Amino acid sequence: MKRDFMENWKTNLYRFLGPYAAFLLVMWFSSMNMTNFNEFSDIVSGTFFSVLFFGGSFTASYVLETMNTQQKRISFLMLPATSFEKFLARFLYVTIGFVVLSTVALLLAEVTRFLLLPLFDLPETFKQSTLPRVWQTIMNFRTFDFNGSGVMESVVGWLFFIWIHSFFLLGGCRWYNHAFWKTLGLMLL
C-alpha cells in the first residue's frame, strides 16, 4: 500500500484536487446567491453525496490499475503477498481511501471558505460550519420514499450506493484499461 502511495503520488494528488475543487466551487457559487443557510448546507450535502457516488464509482473502477501494462502486471504479481492480500490492499486503497480523501477535501474546502469569508458581504448565518448539517444528512440518507422506518430508508439508500459501487469494482477487476467507461457502457445496455 505504501508503494502505491509513493509511486502514484501525482494521481493521488489529482484525485484529491478534484473533490476539493468541486466542494470549493459549489460553496463559492452557491453562497453568492443564497440568503438561507439551510439551503446552502443542503447543497453542500448534495455535492458531498455526488462526489462520493460518482468519484467513488470512478476510483472503484480503477481497483487494478496497477495491472494495465504487462510490466506492471509482472511487478504487481511478484509482490510477496497472497492474491487476496493484494486485492484487499487495493480495495481499501480505492474505497476507504477515497472516502477519507473526500472527507479531507470537504474539511479543507470548509476551512478555505472560512478564510475567504471576510472578503465577501454575506449574512451572519454563513459564518457557521456546514459540517454538522452534512453529517446529519449522511446519517439520514434516503434514496427512495416509501412508508417505513427512517433507519430502514437510510439502510436502503446506503445499500443502493454499495450495490452500484460493487458493479464498478467488478468492472475494474475484469478490465484493466478504460474500466470505468466499459463498465458504464455495460450497465447502460
Question: Over which residues does each language-model region extend?
Answer:
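Hydrophobic alpha-helical transmembrane segments of membrane proteins
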Residues: M1-I74, S83-L189
